[in-house]
Amino acid sequence: MNDPWEEGLRLFEEGHFEQALYFLEDIDPIEVPDAAYYQALCYSQLGRAEEALKSLDLVIVQESNFLKILQARMIRAFLLTTEKRYPAAEKELKGMIDEGVESVQVFSNYGYVLWATGRGKEGVAWLNRAVTLDPGNANAMNSLGYILAEEGVFLERALQLCRKALALKPENPTYLDSLGWVYHRMGQDKVAKFYLEKAVRAQPDNPDFRQHQRMVLQSLGEESITKRRS
């Protein structure tokens, strides 16, 4: 049988995260420093945020490589954001920015957190910085486009950004939802319905996607269809 570390790493690289954890969880991170990092990545992919955060905390404490620590902190901030623990996410992101970190991931995540906590103009400014730093970054473009649509401003630019993001990752359900939502905000609900239905089919349990779909169907006079399907 292969060495547990090598087998766990192989399974991780193949995208078999549950199987990878079978091997990685039994490895002492003190003996194999990278074990905690890959454990965290597996937990994150499997939606086990709390376990991922604990592993990332261990990486940050024991790792000596600055880039690995920075990567762990960025993943930690992202997980805190997805869990809607915005004060903790903001503290982590602000700390990296104050240290001089210039990263599209940090800027876009920070912008989203600011917007989510009621500071829309500041959030848009940081997302613009992210897109300027990396004009081809799909996540930054999608986040900025979605937030512009939510704010009801610069809708043509929002449409352009979300279309570019989706062109880079055509099957990404979040990008499908964002583009559908932009079309809704522009009053083009028939087009919005097409993209939102694709997003819901890809992630039927996502409450935000379903809420957007319901609102569009209601606008089209078709809300009873969604109620029958729920």
Question: Where is each model-derived feature located?
Answer:
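Short coil turns that delineate tetratricopeptide repeat
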Residues: I30-V32, S64-L67, V101, P135, ...
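TPR alpha-solenoid repeat register
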Residues: A35-Y37, I69-A72, V106, A140, ...
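Alpha-helical segment of the N-proximal tetratricopeptide repeat
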Residues: N2-D26, Y38, I75-K84
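TPR/TPR-like (Sel1-like) alpha-helical repeat modules
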Residues: P29, V61-Q62, H184, D189-Q218, ...
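Conserved structural position within tetratricopeptide repeats
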Residues: E25-P29, V61-S64, K94-D98, R129-T132, ...
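Structural signature of tandem alpha-helical TPR/SEL1-like repeats
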Residues: G15-Q19, G47-S55, E83-G95, A116-R129, ...
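Residue-level recognition of tetratricopeptide repeat
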Residues: L9, L41, F78, Y112, ...
